[in-house]
Amino acid sequence: MYNVRGDLNRKTPSDGNVNEIGSMYASRDTSTSSFTNPTDSSTRLLYNNASNATFSSAALAAGVGGTRASGYTHRFSIRPSSQTYNRYPNGGNSAGSDMYSTSPQNNSIVDDIENINKLEAVAFAGPTAGESDFSLSREDKEIDDFLHYPLPAKDAKKLSYFVGGEGLMQLLFLLFLAAGTGMLFIGLPILTYTGHNSLASTRVTGITNHQFRILRLLRYGSLIDPDTPESAYTFDSQDLGTLDLVFSDEFNYPGRAFYDGDDQFWLATDLHYAATTDYEYYDADTPTTANGTLRLRMDAFYNHDLNFRSGMVTTWNKLCFKGGRIEVSASLGGSPYIPGFWPGIWTIGNLVRPGYLATSDGVWPYSYNSCDAGITPNQSDPSGISYLGGQRLNQCVCKGEDHPNVGTGRGGPEIDALEGTFGSGIPYNGSIYLETMPVVSQSAQYAPFDLYMYPNYDFVTIYNQSVSAMNGWAGGVYQQALSCASQLNNSWLSGNAYQKYGFDYKPGSGPDALISWFVGDEYTWTMRQPAVGQNGNIASRPVSEEPMIVVLNFGISPTWIYFYWYELTFPQTMYVDYVRIYQDSSDSSSVLGCDPEGFPTTEYIANHPKAYLNYNATSWSEAGYVRPKNSLMDGC
């Protein structure tokens, strides 16, 4: 065992006078650190952590202390002379003494700092003189350099190394990708461009992939359904002459939905129709299409605190028409023997959104363009003939007030293609009256009202009195109704068979303005405008000049008909095969759109969202708006 604790003057067993540092570098086979007095400055340069420790010769031979402590042992290792050196000789601080002089008592004392510095320099010089184990030059190559520098600097300029086979393939792929992208976004539009697409086309031959329901049903250039047969493209009206088809919907695409934004023309109602105290809730998920028909199904289903659920769709603020013919093929819901249901196919001015009572306040069912007692609340009649609050958008509204177009009386008149019911009073075979026969009421609703609600029947025509008769109900305190009831075939209900219903009409005043209703191919009755001409202190009321929307619904209400609860069965469905609109292209009074000249609606609707989007508001003031002032009642 070698005790390395001591000073540099300690002798080894083999050499009585050998320097401790030199002995560590005596041969190439053994390399170790010098472990000397930790207070010795020369020793601290080699190993600062040397302390009291005892090491075996085997440990020393293995190189304890590491490369940095021991340095390299090779043929150029410096072996100091055999004499003993002492960095701090005795008396080194006394007068006349030389700290680097040789002490006679210690054989000779020489400063070993130079030897130590040389030793450290050689330790970092590498195993061979002139070489460095820590090469910093790229020119020095080692056997594993290819892993780190696959392209030596001297070879970087060679094209074969710069590109290579793989690089060439990548370059070709990038060029192909760039060419394909350019072809897709530049070449393809150029190759497929066919020139200007005229909007005057009458047919839509293709739309898009059927997987995209909404996009597939969009129609550009024509509002005619591609599934409408060409034989239905024109119609010869008894009063209006030859008419051209301008809109149709055959409902042939299955699974259509009618939530807001789902359909180009139709919008499902989602509310309780409180205006007529209906028992059902109109749910927007109810209307759908299947087997070529629109289906409005009523279920005894608890929904929104009501016991029934059904469907209503409208074209409100999407599709409007003024003048022409509307034709609807339908099979009404319910049993032909049990009364109770209320199917409807009707139209109303676009300024009224069905079910939104604030929009109908002071607007429905006015068709009036005069400034007199007809615009006032209750028609200024103390007899209580009318409970209406007066025409809000009347002709004499002051300039600058809230009105779609000041100077024109505006309203929301209603024309019904049918309201399904059962009724007595309808002649059967000329003499027998049946209370359980299905009939349709075809009517026009007006305000202000005639005196005693009695129109001028000289301008009313009923074509077949064996199946049609004027309705005994002429209206109430909120509307005057000119209505004719016609009996139906029992098979025209519940999807068993379909029948056509609708009307032709020409807007305006005078004997040429009229409405003619029909069932199937037969006209049932006609009302010419003078039937609601001037009467008492009320001026003439024109046939609706407002842009009209289409409404299809299937309801149940105690205000419409008496029914027997225990005999009603559910579910019941109303089916609609198609809706078609015809107009005379040469007639300036016939317009397809919601903003015909002199009767705009869309801007006014957009400016009053609190009324047109909130069905909980039941009056114009409740929606947060003020009735406009007029010269007759307020002065301007």
From Swiss-Prot:
Tree of life domain: Eukaryota
Residues exposed to the Lumenal side: 192-636
Membrane topology: Single-pass type II membrane protein
Region of interest (Disordered), ranges: 1-22, 81-107
GO MF term list: glucosidase activity
Keyword set includes Ribonucleoprotein: no
CC annotations in GO: endoplasmic reticulum; endoplasmic reticulum membrane; plasma membrane
Transmembrane region(s): 171-191
Ranges of the Cytoplasmic topological domain: 1-170
Keyword terms: Cell wall biogenesis/degradation, Endoplasmic reticulum, Glycoprotein, Membrane, Signal-anchor, Transmembrane, Transmembrane helix
Pfam family, one: SKN1_KRE6_Sbg1
Glycan-carrying positions: N291, N378, N429, N464, N489, N616
Protein location: Endoplasmic reticulum membrane
Name the record gives this protein: Uncharacterized beta-glucan synthesis-associated protein C17G6.11c
Organism: Schizosaccharomyces pombe (strain 972 / ATCC 24843)
Organism taxonomic ancestry: Eukaryota, Fungi, Dikarya, Ascomycota, Taphrinomycotina
